[in-house]
Swiss-Prot record:
Belongs to the cytochrome P450 family. It is found in: Endoplasmic reticulum membrane; Microsome membrane. Keywords: Endoplasmic reticulum, Heme, Iron, Membrane, Metal-binding, Microsome, Monooxygenase, Oxidoreductase. One of its GO terms (cellular component) is endoplasmic reticulum membrane. It holds the Pfam family p450. May be involved in the metabolism of insect hormones and in the breakdown of synthetic insecticides. GO terms for molecular function: heme binding; iron ion binding; monooxygenase activity; oxidoreductase activity, acting on paired donors, with incorporation or reduction of molecular oxygen. Gene3D superfamilies: Cytochrome P450 (1.10.630.10). It comes from the Eukaryota. Its cofactor is heme. PANTHER family: CYTOCHROME P450 4P1-RELATED (PTHR24291:SF105), CYTOCHROME P450 FAMILY 4 (PTHR24291). It is a peripheral membrane protein. This is Probable cytochrome P450 4ac2.
Amino acid sequence: MFLEVLFAAPLVIFIFRKLWAHLNRTYFILSLCKRIRTEDGSLLESKIYVAPSKTRFGNNFDLVNFTSESIFNFMRDASAKAKGRNYLWYFFHAPMYNIVRAEEAEEILQSSKLITKNMIYELLKPFLGEGLLISTDQKWHSRRKALTPAFHFKVLQSFLIIFKEECNKLVKVLHQSVNMELELNQVIPQFTLNNVCETALGVKLDDLSEGIRYRQSIHAIEEVMQQRLCNPFFYNIVYFFLFGDYRKQVNNLKIAHEFSSNIIEKRRSLFKSNQLGQEDEFGKKQRYAMLDTLLAAEADGQIDHQGICDEVNTFMFEGYDTTSTCLIFTLLMLALHEDVQKKCYEEIKYLPDDSDDISVFQFNELVYMECVIKESLRLFPSVPFIGRRCVEEGVVNGLIMPKNTQINIHLYEIMRDARHFSNPKMFQPDRFFPENTVNRHPFAFVPFSAGQRNCIGQKFAILEIKVLLAAVIRNFKILPVTLLDDLTFENGIVLRTKQNIKVKLVHRENK
């Protein structure tokens, strides 16, 4: 009997190894997921760079215990090693397809099937629910349709007045900081949050006692999201509950959600009593807010209370952080490039200074300033990565993607591709003059994403940014303090730097 087992053992081992090898061609067994294959049967490495891993379990342990700084560097290093090719990682339960080329990004972003966001966005669900950023299929289509009127030209004109008022308040604050180092990270986010709060909810955040707590809660929620982003094990809710800042997230979500929910209830009461647009208790006519569009949709049965909360929280989150990030980097680049700042001043100095005498059309004519904003977004996209998920097996870019494949589109790399932008690290606003964009790939510059899931509020954001830049440049010269070499970039929901970005303001003569 012993001899039979002894002689049979090699055969069993041989069969097991053959079976393992056969299965492992289709499945990455130790990573518990199906492999990506080529549609034409060619070697996978001929189509895509397969990134090496630290262990036999795929790339799962490559990201453990990273900081927001080190994970950003890891992503950039991985792209550098791929040498301009798209590349592949394998995580537990799912492969991740990383896209760094505009050509392949186009197919993804233009697809009518690949509209579901990837697992990273699941981390936002406790805050944003099923809002426009995260929702998919019919819910997304109906919500997008319902919200589109909130960004109509006439609505933007009414928002322009709010932007101007907040700019005037900010300029008064900035006058107190003249000839001193100014930390942009301390003043700009407050400006954008005030803007988005009044345009989304119809209330002035500075007038509310809860305003400070709300700002603090948003910041705390982002800190927890940052923690989860830096460790894939925290994506698991049980692991996060046991070892992460779960209670911190819950407590601050309660503050943020109660704030927006209370405002919604007050606005709903006015809506039902047909008092919107009438004078409030201070004798001021109440302005339109994005929330009014949602309340009208609720009255028509298109959305419920939770849906309204989700959309308001989504707009507050997206409109606050991304815009402030763009403004901070643009002001930094203006400080570092005096010639560009001078051209912007020449373009805006004849704009009417009175909000009653200015229109969206006049800001649309600030062509050079828009080129400056675009170049800033190209170098420093507010959202450096966007994601999709395959909800079913299908062919993408000539590759057979298994169900649940995660797709990561690296906007940071795509918009620094030397094939589309010569001297890609240089700040050159002229590259966005119409004559210089003729032969450029249409998906080489996509800071607001593209296709049907592009950012619904991009015109809102560009207008808000122009209004603030015009106000600052009209009143002050911006001088550099922080240099690009001083900065350490961090990866999060939005692009951040470890250091606060500082400039120095001096009054303009003969303003």
